[in-house]
Amino acid sequence: MEPRIWLIAGPTASGKSALALRLAEASGAEIVNADSMQLYAGLRVLTAGPGPEETARAPHHLFGSVDPADGWSVGRWLRAASEVIADIRGRGRPVVVVGGTGLYFRALTQGLAEIPEVPADVRAKAAADFERMGEAAFRTRLAEVDPAAAARIAPGDRQRLCRAWEVFAATGQALSDLQRTGAPAIADWSAVALEPPRPALYARCDARLHAMVREGALEEVRALIARNLDPALPAMKAVGVREFAAHLRGETSLEAAVEAAQQETRRYAKRQITWMRGQMAGWPRLTADDHEGQWRQFLAQEPGLTP
């Protein structure tokens, strides 16, 4: 019998990392990251990645392993994750894939088409169009050919908006359609999605920001902005980078920066929940508002596991 694969999805601060670690310890599994921001090195505190204590309790993969200057696509993550999962299972161990990036889970379970390389002149024209038209008009134009991408991509995400348009311009096909085709990378998987009550989730988001400041998030942002990277890179869009960078430049107080980051974290969690409800409607839900309750709910669905 092939080693098990468990998928654990959930919004930020929902408790999914704690559940994944407990499951890994109970089953002997290794943990694979499916969070697009926890990929990047130097942002462990800001992205709530695993620390030395967690990594000592179970092997973790694809956390903090990518330079922020190297922006990864969904396809690149899928190739890396598929290799890691195959290696873990080849050694006879189960796998827990955990994160909050819905596109990663969709690519893993439904497949991802090989998207042709976009010519440099098409990329340049998309970027120029964005600057000329502005985000609102550019998004409206994108919605005419790829409404799913236009609705899904977060405000201010120039890179993904341009990417969606340039793929259509180069291929004549919507990026959203291409992302739905291809062979699944894994089979015979089990999944849960965490969706604690909204008030408890938001309170946890707020508390987490204060803890991040105490644990060194400002120092991480200071080191990141000192590199003068392209602001369109994915790592530069991590929640807290823009807000804390404004404080470090003397443009706002620390209190105001924390409040702004808390608000953006809640918005991000809401977008993740919306994605889960639309794209993971068939995944069993864990709705408890604490780690113990979530673990009990999980065990009820996995009677073969022992606490």
UniProtKB/Swiss-Prot annotation:
Site, Interaction with substrate tRNA: residue positions: 101, 123
Subunit structure: Monomer.
EC number(s) per entry: 2.5.1.75
Pfam families, sorted: IPPT (PF01715)
InterPro entries per the UniProt record, alphabetical: Dimethylallyltransferase, IPT, P-loop_NTPase
SUPFAM superfamilies, per the entry: P-loop containing nucleoside triphosphate hydrolases
Catalyses which reaction(s): adenosine(37) in tRNA + dimethylallyl diphosphate = N(6)-dimethylallyladenosine(37) in tRNA + diphosphate
Positions bound to ATP: 10-17
HAMAP family: IPP_trans
Entry protein name: tRNA dimethylallyltransferase
Family, as annotated: Belongs to the IPP transferase family.
Names of the cofactor(s): Mg(2+)
UniProt GO MF annotations: ATP binding; tRNA dimethylallyltransferase activity
Function: Catalyzes the transfer of a dimethylallyl group onto the adenine at position 37 in tRNAs that read codons beginning with uridine, leading to the formation of N6-(dimethylallyl)adenosine (i(6)A).
The UniProt record lists the keyword Nucleus: no
Gene3D superfamilies per the UniProt record, alphabetical: 1.10.20.140, P-loop containing nucleotide triphosphate hydrolases
One of the GO biological process terms: tRNA modification
Entry annotated with the keyword Magnesium: yes
Entry keywords, A to Z: ATP-binding, Magnesium, Nucleotide-binding, Transferase, tRNA processing
Amino-acid positions noted as binding substrate in the UniProt annotation, renumbered to this chain: 12-17
Start and end residues of each stretch annotated as Interaction with substrate tRNA: 35-38, 159-163
